[in-house]
Amino acid sequence: MNQRQLMQMAQQMQRQMQKVQEELAATIVEGTAGGGAIVVKMNGHREVQSITISPEVVDPNDVDMLQDLLLVAINDASRKAQQLAEERMQPLTGGLKGLF
């Protein structure tokens, strides 16, 4: 393989990675807690897009529970977004884990 072919392959891979990055930005995953009482929507770049809180879990006397549920939902969405990114990037990275 000559240098020109290597450059073409690198450019093609760069275009494919850009396409995957755009797809990740447009793909939404949901993390939930409390049986769906809290829903966090996050894109494939792990940017929170929205948080929905059911009024039933808003208790001014138990703010700790609400905070715990939010953490669970955010972490759930983050794990799903990470898994999505790994799945989408896997064909381009040859299965190397932990890059994205």
Swiss-Prot record:
Subcellular localization: Cytoplasm, Nucleoid
SUPFAM superfamilies (alphabetical): YbaB-like (SSF82607)
Disulfide bonding pattern of the chain: none
Assigned keywords, A-Z: Cytoplasm, DNA-binding
Main location: cytoplasm
Signal peptide stretch: none
Gene Ontology MF terms: DNA binding
Cross-referenced InterPro entries: YbaB-like_sf, YbaB/EbfC
Domain of life per record: Bacteria
GO annotation, cellular component aspect: bacterial nucleoid; cytosol
Quaternary structure and partners: Homodimer.
Purpose: Binds to DNA and alters its conformation. May be involved in regulation of gene expression, nucleoid organization and DNA protection.
Family statement: Belongs to the YbaB/EbfC family.
HAMAP family named among the record's database cross-references: DNA_YbaB_EbfC
UniProt-recorded name of the protein: Nucleoid-associated protein Cagg_3200
Organism: Chloroflexus aggregans (strain MD-66 / DSM 9485)
